[in-house]
From Swiss-Prot:
Pfam families linked: Ribosomal_L32p
Keywords: Ribonucleoprotein, Ribosomal protein
Family: Belongs to the bacterial ribosomal protein bL32 family.
Name of this protein: Large ribosomal subunit protein bL32
UniProt-listed GO biological process terms: translation
InterPro entries: Ribosomal_bL32, Ribosomal_bL32_bact, Ribosomal_zn-bd
Chain intervals for the UniProt region annotation (Disordered): 1-24
Gene: rpmF
């Protein structure tokens, strides 16, 4: 098992963790339904970039 030769200082430890912060999700408003959604995803009604990608089938 690998063991560090020297103790990592508090400064270097914190610099290593500088990219670990939690960032909020980028939420956009759908142009067709007006609902909030994640970018680059198909909307609830089946549209993507203003075009119908698929049509939801009715449950039998």
């Amino acid at each position: 098992m690998a063991v560090p030769k020297r103790k990592k200082s508090k400064s270097r430890r914190n610099m290593h963790r500088s990219h670990h912060a939690i960032e909020p999700k980028n939420v956009v408003v759908c142009s067709t339904t007006g609902e909030f959604m994640l970018p680059h995803n198909v909307a609830v009604d089946g549209s993507y970039k203003g075009k119908r990608v698929f049509i939801k089938q009715q449950a039998e």
